[in-house]
């Protein structure tokens, strides 16, 4: 799995994938093309941003998704992990490779000590994140009634992994 700087065209693909899975997101509103371009210019391309995003490539050139280490607290060595894959690559093992690459980037290259995340019970990827967290010796906490989606409340799973 190769991590590369994302391009504006790749982020447009990601926007379309993201808008198909709103129930899984902390901010469940669709993004417009203009919003995504603004995000690319002000966050992704900003070296002073507290967010680092990476285009995920399988092999030499196949773009499969976007990963991030976001909400970075440099002084505390903390970052939140994020991941979105093209629908055609979900469930294929690429997610596991992407998370391993992001964790290595965070711990080995960026000097982070803790990587955390959140996944809602209404997200089919919750089992994926449970397995990944356990494999990396992490800790899981369930937060009841954390996410409101279409009139129903869902629990959230918070997970934390530490540099070994």
Question: Would you name each region that the model predicts?
Answer:
Residues 1-19, 53, 58-164:
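Acyl-donor (CoA/ACP) binding surface of acyl/acetyltransferases
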Residues 5, 30, 43-46:
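Short secondary-structure boundary/capping segments within folded domains
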Residues 22-41:
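Conserved GNAT-fold acetyl-CoA-binding loop/helix
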Residues 33-37, 45-46, 85-86:
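Juxtamembrane/interface motifs at transmembrane-helix termini
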């Amino acid at each position: 799995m190769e991590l590369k700087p994302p391009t504006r065209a790749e982020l447009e693909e990601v926007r379309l994938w993201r808008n198909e899975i709103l129930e899984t997101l902390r901010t469940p509103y669709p993004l417009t093309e203009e919003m995504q371009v603004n995000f690319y210019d002000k966050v992704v391309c900003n070296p002073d941003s507290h967010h680092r995003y990476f285009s995920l490539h399988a092999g030499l050139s196949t773009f499969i998704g976007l990963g991030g280490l976001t909400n970075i607290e440099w002084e505390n060595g903390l970052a939140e992990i994020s991941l979105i894959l093209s629908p055609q690559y979900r469930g294929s093992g690429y997610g596991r490779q992407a998370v391993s690459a992001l964790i290595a980037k965070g711990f080995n290259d960026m000097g982070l000590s803790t990587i955390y995340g959140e996944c809602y019970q209404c997200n089919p990827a919750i089992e994926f994140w449970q397995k990944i967290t356990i494999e990396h010796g992490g800790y899981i906490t369930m937060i009841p009634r954390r996410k409101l989606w279409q009139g129903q409340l869902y629990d959230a799973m918070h997970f934390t992994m530490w540099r070994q």
